[in-house]
């Protein structure tokens, strides 16, 4: 039995705001957002682009990561987290 990967992702909207979510199919979810069928928040801020994502072994882990990420209230706090974690990915 294989476990399905899950993703916590961050989108940058056309108005430069950030949207955070989780999914088990990142490519499909991004397409859904850009088709105007995703979250209400992104529907009116199209197009959106994938800014960052993390891979997890379960949906629950991705949901937890999303909740923790959303505790960062300011854009600068969120971008600092992304910058730090992207550097860590490159160093592995």
UniProtKB/Swiss-Prot annotation:
| Residue ranges occupied by any GIY-YIG domain in the UniProt entry | 4-80
Q: Which Gene3D superfamilies match?
A: GIY-YIG endonuclease
**Family matches, as CDD domains:** GIY-YIG_UPF0213
The protein's matches in InterPro entries, at most eight in alphabetical order, are given as: GIY-YIG_endonuc, GIY-YIG_endonuc_sf, UPF0213_domain
SUPFAM superfamilies named in the record: GIY-YIG endonuclease
The similarity annotation says: Belongs to the UPF0213 family.
The protein's name is: UPF0213 protein SpyM50708
